[in-house]
Design a protein with these regions (language model features):
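Walker A/P-loop nucleotide-binding motif
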Residues: 3-19
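Residue-level preference for the first positions of well-ordered beta-strands
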Residues: 5-7, 33, 67
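Short, flexible micro-motifs
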Residues: 13-18, 27, 77, 142
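Post-Walker A helix-loop "phosphate-sensing" segment adjacent to the P-loop in P-loop NTPases
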Residues: 25-37
């Protein structure tokens, strides 16, 4: 029931989408509505709604869903009007509904997803990062060919403990 964003980053194949889907399944089990879409699919649906005069209705529909999972943010650079659409959606959901975002980009690179508008990038990313749970996954790709008994392993980055010897 918490509305804080969950941001999951890491290289390709480390389980970001899988983890996001697991969060979605947990929400569904608790009776919540969930929408899972790639960033490109989400923005294409908003663009299609604009073309038939239903942009505001579609935006509000996505803004109200209790959990929105946006997969592969930053995979492609956002150009107008997609950059504005994503900002509008994030602004509508800000502190109102839970959003999970996955990305291959490191958190420090998220503004690069908005190459044409640094101010819009800053405003959007700032809303996403505010009170967010930030997870960084690392490891070999689960999709890579496997040799022998070794399995690809993903680790969650953590701060090393201080050893007081």
């Amino acid at each position: 029931d918490e509305r804080a964003p969950v941001l999951i980053v890491g290289p390709c194949g480390t389980g970001k989408s899988h983890l996001a889907q697991a969060l979605g399944h947990c929400a569904v089990r608790q009776g919540q509505d969930v929408v899972f879409a790639s960033c490109a699919q989400l923005l294409a649906s908003l663009n299609a709604a604009r073309a038939i005069g239903n942009y505001e209705r579609k935006l509000q529909q996505l803004a109200r869903v209790p959990l929105l999972i946006i997969d592969d943010f930053g995979l492609k650079p956002l150009r107008a009007p997609a950059d504005e659409d994503l900002h509008d959606l994030i602004a509508e959901r800000y502190e109102q509904a839970a959003t999970v975002v996955t990305s291959n980009l490191d958190f420090t690179e998220w503004d690069q997803a908005f190459p044409g508008n640094r101010l819009l990038a800053s405003a959007t990313v700032d809303r996403l990062r505010h009170n967010a749970y930030c997870l960084t996954l690392d490891g070999a790709s689960y999709r890579a060919p496997r040799q022998g008994p070794n399995k690809a392993k993903t680790t969650l980055a953590s701060t090393p403990k201080n050893n007081h010897s």
